[in-house]
Amino acid sequence: LYPSAISKAFGYSTNYQNETNLVNGYGYWLKFADAEEISLIGELCDSQTVNVTTGWNLIGSISSPLDVNLIESNPHGLNTSQFYGYDNGYKIVDAIEPGRGYWVKVSQAGQLILSSQSLVMSKSAIKIVPTNDLPPKPPDVN
């Protein structure tokens, strides 16, 4: 998938799993020897509905930045943790950036709705509840 990656792509569903087919909306863990810029080819994705399960989920992004407070859910008002990105360790983020994956813990199964059309918080917006829990450790790819 990514010739310069030094690991396979890992998805997450209660544990890490090797993935050979990447699906829009979901996040994946890949390891590279050095920082690099990757070009993605395809159609722009301005909205995405992501199925999530109770507990930690690794989600993807859309083609434009999105403030996490504008993410909607089904059921409405789904409780989530803060969103975490990874940069030599987990960091709480305020926005979902294109081409990156993010961790979020949810209180129940449902759907997260990421849309560039979301301009104001709606009654279906998620409810972010701060937690001290951190996402799962990265997969062992040594």
Question: Where do the model's predicted regions map?
Answer:
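N-terminal exported-region signature
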Residues: L1-N142
